[in-house]
Amino acid sequence: MLKLRDWQEKLKDKVIEGLRNNFLVALNAPTGSGKTLFSLLVSLEVKPKVLFVVRTHNEFYPIYRDLTKIREKRNITFSFLVGKPSSCLYAEKGAESEDIPCKYCELKGSIVEVKTDDSPLSLVKKLKKDGLQDKFCPYYSLLNSLYKADVIALTYPYFFIDRYREFIDIDLREYMIVIDEAHNLDKVNELEERSLSEITIQMAIKQSKSEESRRILSKLLNQLREVVLPDEKYIKVENVPKLSKEELEILADDYEDIRKDSLKQGKVNKIHIGSILRFFSLLSIGSFIPFSYSKRLVIKNPEISYYLNLLNDNELSIILMSGTLPPREYMEKVWGIKRNMLYLDVEREIQKRVSGSYECYIGVDVTSKYDMRSDNMWKRYADYLLKIYFQAKANVLVVFPSYEIMDRVMSRISLPKYVESEDSSVEDLYSAISANNKVLIGSVGKGKLAEGIELRNNDRSLISDVVIVGIPYPPPDDYLKILAQRVSLKMNRENEEFLFKIPALVTIKQAIGRAIRDVNDKCNVWLLDKRFESLYWKKNLKCLNANKMKL
């Protein structure tokens, strides 16, 4: 018999009642407290079908795992959908969905019944292996299976981006919708973010089959070099490179030829002309603003509520859940949630801790404040990391505000370390950990290692210490100024907390959550910035009795 935890028993009826009364439920429950199982149970009490919306494919597994526990009593079917790059038989690493020319593929209409009796990622591997042998399409087979399953899982784009949601064509009103890791909704606009770099254009020139295309791309490359800057912050660009309608059509014809040829060869790689076309297509909409960032031209839509407006549809039953949800007012003002909301903080509701614990230490002789940054400060931070590493019982997760600061500090350290990059993977990190007794893991706030990893062995956390190097405030750049203007209009006042403190607080809590994934986990949290001494940080990070320290 499935036994519920104390908080699940106490809040189950309250959540079900809220959902039946058409409230959007916001559930703030610590990592490892059983949110997934709880949301499954309450959802199936309200509606016969459940849609889980998650950030990454890796997050399909907890749904499959917990559904297996329920299946012992109820015959509930499960399915999921991964993107074409992950399921197409001919897609190579790096290919984008639009690069894959399904309309020319003879397997598009060849589908098989999919039975999800294995973990999702293992099933995808099996489907791809069988698909090559038996000549069927894994992607369209998975898509077809969605319409027959009781519980389905999709990644964010299939829910928040109109064209992808319309493509899968399911009636959302039939489902109880559970949006997991909902603190990430702060970055939902990044799903459509596009960038243009010298490397992209140079690779497009190499791939191009047309002399005319190469001429257009060479001109574009020269224009790009005139407007991009090396700074690791968003700087608004006024004179954006332009392509005429005729030039875009020439590139589009070239792109289509490359797509056809790649399918004929049985290898669909990333087609860089497609990236350029999608960049200009989005730019033409008008709601995207161009910025220079680290030698790239980036277009962003700063209106987060544009993507989240679907949450206000009163015909939809929705649970938002996370271990680090922002406050209710933030969700209403910044995210634009206007419908009735039942906001539940589990530990406050039951007046009891349901997560692991940690000891806090504040370094009062360092800071990442802009006017205090120097080589001497980076050396101090490196000395702190050495000190922390040698007393640590296991691996040390270090979270930096930016790649620049991470490079300046970690380059001074010769200990066993793994430093996050664009190509970082959990597999590589595990290899580094298994090769050493303990490792300094360098990560950037909101990056894949500070939020997306779970390092455990035999139900024991492999991280004993979490170090926050400076406060991970967003940089005061042109993008933040635009956000500030929009938030001020919504609130009729400026709000430092909403712009700076709450996003940084969520980032820090997520990092701490990497080490305490279970109620029995314990870790040390090192807050290396003298600004953490303020009551705001000590209260919100539950560090009122923090130990102060100096080198």
Curated annotation (Swiss-Prot):
InterPro entries associated with the record: ATP-dep_Helicase_C, DinG/Rad3-like, Helic_SF1/SF2_ATP-bd_DinG/Rad3, Helicase-like_DEXD_c2, Helicase_ATP-bd, P-loop_NTPase, RAD3-like_helicase_DEAD
- Which SMART domains does the entry mention? DEXDc2, HELICc2
The reply to whether Transcription figures as a keyword in the UniProt entry is: yes
Q: Name the job this protein performs.
A: ATP-dependent 5'-3' DNA helicase. Thought to be involved in nucleotide excision repair (NER) of DNA.
Which family, according to UniProt?
Belongs to the helicase family. RAD3/XPD subfamily.
Per the record, what about its domains?
A: [4Fe-4S]-binding is required for protein stability and helicase activity.
Q: What is this protein called?
A: ATP-dependent DNA helicase XPD
